[in-house]
Each structure stands twice: as C-alpha cells, then as structure tokens.
Swiss-Prot record:
SUPFAM superfamilies: GatB/YqeY motif, Glutamine synthetase/guanido kinase. The gene is gatB. Gene3D superfamilies: 1.10.10.410, GatB domain, N-terminal subdomain (1.10.150.380). One of its GO terms (biological process) is translation. Belongs to the GatB/GatE family. GatB subfamily. Pfam families: GatB_N, GatB_Yqey. InterPro entries: Asn/Gln-tRNA_amidoTrfase_suB/E (IPR017959), Asn/Gln-tRNA_Trfase_suB/E_cat (IPR006075), Asn/Gln_amidotransferase (IPR018027), Asn/Gln_tRNA_amidoTrase-B-like (IPR003789), GatB (IPR004413), GatB_C_1 (IPR042114), GatB_Yqey_C_2 (IPR023168), Gln-tRNA_amidoTrfase_suB_CS (IPR017958). Keywords: ATP-binding, Ligase, Nucleotide-binding, Protein biosynthesis. It catalyses: L-glutamyl-tRNA(Gln) + L-glutamine + ATP + H2O = L-glutaminyl-tRNA(Gln) + L-glutamate + ADP + phosphate + H(+); L-aspartyl-tRNA(Asn) + L-glutamine + ATP + H2O = L-asparaginyl-tRNA(Asn) + L-glutamate + ADP + phosphate + 2 H(+). Heterotrimer of A, B and C subunits. Disulfide bonds: none annotated. It comes from the Bacteria. This is Aspartyl/glutamyl-tRNA(Asn/Gln) amidotransferase subunit B.
Length: 476
C-alpha cells in the first residue's frame, strides 16, 4: 500500500523590538529572571495594555514579504487558558481577523521550484517560561511574558520532510532580511510546531494528524517528520487506527513519543479584547511599510548572478544570512572583485566562523579591511600564502592590512631588478637543473622556483619569478 503525506507548519517568530507587545517592559535575551516584566504583563487589575506600533509595523513588513493580503481593519482577541507561565490567564492575539492572509513562499528543492501557501499570519504576545528544578520546585520566569510574536501558519501544501525544511529555511531568510527578527532557534526567537498526516494515495479525506513539538532545529523538524511518516504508515498497514496526538521528538533516539491524546478541539473561548480599540491600517502607514521594504534574498541572488557575475551557488551561500550578504555588498562597494570577495567569505571566513562557533559580527573583520587585503593580492603586493597570515590578523584584531604587511616586512618582492640577481645566482649554483630543463625535465623548474622562494623567505612574487626564470633559462 502506498501513502501520501500532508504537512503544515506553525511558526512563532519573536519580533525584534525594544519593548513588549502591549507593555513598556524591556526585551533583553538572557537577562536575570523576572527583571524585564511589570504589572501589565502580570495582569494586575486596573492595568491596561497599549499596542506597540513598532511591533505591528514589523508584522506588516513580514506580511508584505510573504505576499499576504494585509487586513486594513482588524481587532485583537482574548485567547483564554490557564498555565503557570501565563499569570493573566489569557493571551492577546488576533483570531477573527488576522494581520495577513493568503500569502506564499517559493522554495527550491533539487532544482525544482514549488509555491507553498501561507494561510494566515497574526501578531500576539508570548508566554513566560517554566523551569522544573532538581530540588522538586518549579520556577516561572516572566521576562518573556508579553514579548511580541508573529505566528505564521502555512497551508497544508507540503508533502515531504525536505519540503518542510526548505520552507523553514526560506522563511528564516525572508524574515531576517526584513529586519523583523533575528530568527535564532537557539535563543527561542523562532519556534516550530508541525502537523502531519498520512493517507492512502488517492484518498480524498485527509488522514488523522499528529502534532510534533520539542523541535529545536530545522534538522529535528526533518527527522521528526520522517519518523512520523514511517510510524503512521506502519499503523495503517497493520490496520490500526491513528489517534490525534501531540508528540515530542527525541533527538537521541530520532523517534517521537506520545505527550497527550487530543480528545477534541481546544476551546479557548475567544472574544474581542475589550481593552484595545479596533485597528485601522491607513494608506499612509501601509505605503510607508511598502516603501521601506528592503531587498529580499531571492532578488539579491538574481542580482548577484545577473549583475555581478557570480555562480548561482555563490549567490545562494552569500544570501543565507543578511549579515553575510550585507558584508559582501560592503566589501564589493570598497573596490574588491565580487568573485574574490565571495571566495574569501565562503572559504576562509566561513571556516573561521565554524571553527570558533561564532557569528561574523563577533569578529574584528570589516568589509573595508577584507577588500583592502584582496586588492593587495591583486596588485601583487602580497602573495596568497602571505594573505592567509594577514587574514588571521585582520579577523582577530581589526588591523589595517596594508600597514601591518609593511610593518612586518611581508610586502611581496616583485621588482625584476632585485629578483634577477637572485635568480642568476641560483642558476649559477645549479647547472644540473639547467641541464635537466634542457632535456625536457619540467620538474627542474619547480626545484629552481623552490630555491628562489627559500632565498627570498617566501616573499618573491611567484608569477614574476616564473617569468624571469624562464627567460633566464632560455638564454643558457
């Protein structure tokens, strides 16, 4: 029996704001517990929320980037539930009329493009965080309570774990390029829940879906979905019934485990939020958002290929993060050849970042210094070998590359007037190598070049050395 899979994703993204969605409490990741919170977040009687317009504007930017229809008239709703990390016993969200509807993302998998629909996206506030201590007590940190979120709900348009992975990666890039969020799963600013069901091919009715939680990376999403496809398919083959469940993914075993069985639809008793007025998005506000939309990663990739002559692979790597893409553009603007900048960023820079497990912004490297170093190579002032030493200096210490090279005596020797006497001297001492060259033994040239480089302590320009050496050999 063959099956088809249906996958939908719900993604919560923390918006990059200085204060919370409905209160003036600051937002600082990693702050001491319960230091970024106030009576509005706690739901004290008599306190009133105030909408963070900046957060809503960021939500509109994300909606625009996802090609969604933005609701011009909307309101906020209360989602009622009790949990220790939610002292108000309700969440302010958008239920009846979300910020945006009917958007889409275009993903590419193995060279094939596919459009995945966005059912809706809405702004809301986050809950706090529960921690269960080894001392038998549970602790609540309300720093996160009230933080501005946008929830993006996909349509059930995905059918493989690879499509889900590509969707999340593309969504991460798009949101990051808008500047609305850092979208770092390790810091909780991007969280993913999946819904997945399996049914026999050709069946009109969707299968019973399971929800997956505890997905801490895109790879965990892919692995968890792959396991669920296998698990649900085996149940159907065995003639067993699939229950509507919430399951968690265990990264050690690569399997999913039951958290709870869903007995029915959750009843959150939504009703319009009485403490916030209805929202109207005027023409001026919408136009301001549209006029200030930054270039999206797909457009940058196209421009890098069409205008800068980069291979598609390079363009894809460079636009994986806005940080790397902006750095590339700044280095090119400082006069370095695009392909050379790309080579250094994808090679030495990425290797350094991976080795140190840090981001580019945590290094001392600047676009100006990288461009200057690349041009030192182009102008023959330093060799590629010396450039690697220069690179280690400028990425760690914010050093001017040209000044450092000159101070260290690393300027490449390219003057024929200085190189010729060295070359002739080495030839005079190595008649056997001259004879080998004349007898067609090409390795003799390599031997002589090595002697010259040793004599100049590696500072001789290899191209100039080769040209002068060949000219001198042909004279003898």
């Amino acid at each position: 029996m063959n099956f088809e899979t249906t996958i939908g994703l719900e993604v919560h993204i923390e918006l990059k704001t200085n204060s919370k969605m409905y209160s003036p409490s600051p937002v600082n990741y990693g702050a001491e517990p319960n230091t970024n919170t106030n009576v509005i977040d706690w739901g004290y009687p008599g306190t009133l929320p105030t909408l963070n317009k900046g957060a809503y504007t960021l939500g509109m930017m994300v909606a625009t980037a996802l090609h969604a229809d933005i609701a011009r008239d909307t309101h906020f709703d209360r989602k009622n539930y009790f949990y220790p990390d939610n002292p108000k016993a309700y969440q302010i969200t958008q239920y009846e009329q979300p910020l945006g509807k009917d958007g889409y993302i275009e993903v590419e998998i193995d060279g094939h493009k596919k459009q995945i629909g966005i059912a809706e996206l809405h702004v809301e506030e986050d809950a706090g965080k529960n921690t269960h201590g080894s001392d038998g007590y549970s602790y609540v940190d309300l720093n996160r309570q009230g933080t501005a979120l946008i929830e993006i709900v996909s349509k059930p348009d995905m059918s493989t774990p690879e499509e889900a992975y590509a969707y999340l990666e593309t969504l991460r890039q798009i949101v990051q390029f808008t500047g609305a969020s850092d979208v770092k799963m390790e810091e909780g600013s991007m969280r993913v829940d999946t819904n997945i069901s399996v049914r026999p091919i050709g069946a009109k009715k969707y299968g019973v879906k399971s929800e997956l939680k505890n997905l801490n990376s895109f790879n965990h999403v892919r692995l968890g979905l792959a396991y669920e496809i296998k698990r649900q398919s085996q149940l159907l083959i065995a003639g067993e019934t699939i229950r509507p469940e919430t399951r968690r993914f265990d990264e050690k075993s690569g399997e999913t485990y039951l958290m709870r069985v869903k007995s029915g639809a959750d009843d959150y008793r939504y009703f319009p939020e009485p403490d916030l007025p209805p929202m109207h998005i005027g023409d001026d506000w919408l136009k301001e958002v549209q006029d200030n939309m930054p270039e999206m990663p797909a457009k940058r990739r196209t421009r890098y290929v069409d205008e800068l002559g980069l291979p598609e692979y390079d363009a894809g790597v460079l636009t994986n993060t806005k940080e790397m893409s902006d750095f590339f553009e700044a280095a090119v603007a400082n006069g370095a050849a695009p392909k050379q900048v790309s080579n250094w960023l994808m090679g030495e820079v990425n290797a350094y970042l991976n080795d140190k497990q840090i981001d580019l912004q945590e290094t001392a490297l600047t676009p100006e210094h990288l461009a200057q170093m690349i041009n030192l190579i182009k102008d023959g002032i330093i060799s590629s070998k010396i450039a690697k030493k220069v690179f280690q200096e400028i990425i760690q210490n914010d050093t001017d590359p040209k000044a450092w090279v000159e101070a260290k005596g690393m300027v490449q020797l390219s003057d024929p007037a200085k190189l010729t006497p060295i070359i002739t001297g080495i030839l005079d001492d190595n008649q056997q190598s001259i004879d080998d060259f004349k007898n067609g033994k090409d390795r003799a040239v390599g031997f002589l070049v090595g002697k010259i480089m040793k004599e100049t302590r590696g500072q001789a320009n290899p191209k100039v050395v080769n040209d002068l050496l060949m000219a001198e050999l042909n004279k003898r």
